[in-house]
Amino acid sequence: MDINRAIRVAVDTGNVVLGTKQAIKNIKHGEGQLVIVADNCAKDVREDIFYYTQLSETPVYTHQATSIELGAICGKPFPVSALLVLEPGNSAILNVNNEE
């Protein structure tokens, strides 16, 4: 599975929250099925995301792309350090952890 294509399909057809603040906020409320974090996400933010995902038992995938590249994958003209998949739409993005 091409992870970049799966992310783009999820953004286009599903319900995805972009950004670390919104992702953490939704994770705290127990929402979301998968968190994708950019490789260069700030250490303190990454620690917060991992802490809250452990509490909510939400899987996390660390993408090898930078935040600028992840933003481009999502079709956005700005960096995206983290995104939370609420609904995958037509994407197979939720299978990403099974292939690692």
UniProtKB/Swiss-Prot annotation:
<dbReference type="GO" id="GO:0003723">
    <property type="term" value="F:RNA binding"/>
</dbReference>
<dbReference type="GO" id="GO:0022625">
    <property type="term" value="C:cytosolic large ribosomal subunit"/>
</dbReference>
<dbReference type="InterPro" id="IPR029064">
    <property type="entry name" value="Ribosomal_eL30-like_sf"/>
</dbReference>
<keyword id="KW-0689">Ribosomal protein</keyword>
<dbReference type="Pfam" id="PF01248">
    <property type="entry name" value="Ribosomal_L7Ae"/>
</dbReference>
<dbReference type="InterPro" id="IPR004038">
    <property type="entry name" value="Ribosomal_eL8/eL30/eS12/Gad45"/>
</dbReference>
<dbReference type="GO" id="GO:0003735">
    <property type="term" value="F:structural constituent of ribosome"/>
</dbReference>
<keyword id="KW-0687">Ribonucleoprotein</keyword>
<dbReference type="InterPro" id="IPR039109">
    <property type="entry name" value="Ribosomal_eL30-like"/>
</dbReference>
<dbReference type="InterPro" id="IPR000231">
    <property type="entry name" value="Ribosomal_eL30"/>
</dbReference>
<comment type="similarity">
    <text>Belongs to the eukaryotic ribosomal protein eL30 family.</text>
</comment>
<protein>
    <recommendedName>
        <fullName>Large ribosomal subunit protein eL30</fullName>
    </recommendedName>
</protein>
<dbReference type="GO" id="GO:0006412">
    <property type="term" value="P:translation"/>
</dbReference>
<dbReference type="InterPro" id="IPR022991">
    <property type="entry name" value="Ribosomal_eL30_CS"/>
</dbReference>
